[in-house]
Amino acid sequence: MPDRATYHSLFDAVDRYFDLMFDSDVSRFDQVFASSAQLHGLLRDGNLRPLPAKDYKNELASGPSPKSKNAPRQQEILLVDFASPTQAVVKVRVRADTLLYLDYLSYHHIAGAWLITAKSFHVEHRYEVPTN
């Protein structure tokens, strides 16, 4: 069973993930994702979308952030499961602009920091874009 400090440091890492999903500040990307991380999710057509971390970083950098669009911020931790004091899976719900994601984040404690090494994402809900 991990100690209290381990839990707190993992929750801090999840907070960094939530911040990145909201402000898209890629200067902090390497404090959230391991360089070798892989992301996977199904597209609307049912095809699997594999995405290396470097490509995801470029996607975040190339568009406006939810924060810059004054999008609502929504985030919650649904589950934390430690395999060991250095490996955990965290299930989260997080909104990024008009998309509400359900993510499974695999974390490893690497060189003193919790980093995401794999992310499996699912679009749980698509919000309508407000028209003025």
Regions found by a protein language model. Give the residues of each.
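Surface-exposed, charged secondary-structure patches
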Residues: 2, 9-12, 38-100
